[in-house]
């Protein structure tokens, strides 16, 4: 299974040994969105959702999700995360909320999964907090936008 680092020579899943890799500065940025009706978006942006501050709670949930990534994704290394920041932006053209997460560490492996988990958990939290008024919302477009640091260098997603 050449190229797939989470499998050994026999094809069995294993956690990659990063003990010999140098500690370097690493950053990852991910993005996703929750599409909803304009009416539901107004509830969110005007602070009228029954469960409270949707965007504030989703931001905290995303931060918590990034910190718990190694508990959720079986082969992820627990990392000393040094920064998690989430931007949640209402987009009337979508309509919906765009979520972008930036995660940083000084470590031996990257924080791509932490950034993707932060976005996913924030989007799920938005859905949870307003599902009572709209069950047909769509979580969409979750992807890695940027990865820097480590042996493989810089990755930037195409537009």
Swiss-Prot record:
One of its GO terms (molecular function) is cyclic pyranopterin monophosphate synthase activity. The keyword Lyase applies. InterPro entries: MoaC (IPR023045), MoaC_bact/euk (IPR047594), MoaC_sf (IPR036522), MoCo_biosynth_MoaA/MoaC (IPR050105), Mopterin_CF_biosynth-C_dom (IPR002820). One of its GO terms (biological process) is Mo-molybdopterin cofactor biosynthetic process. The active site is at residue 128. NCBIfam families: moaC (TIGR00581), PRK09364.1 (NF006870). Belongs to the MoaC family. This is Cyclic pyranopterin monophosphate synthase. It comes from Cereibacter sphaeroides (strain ATCC 17023 / DSM 158 / JCM 6121 / CCUG 31486 / LMG 2827 / NBRC 12203 / NCIMB 8253 / ATH 2.4.1.).
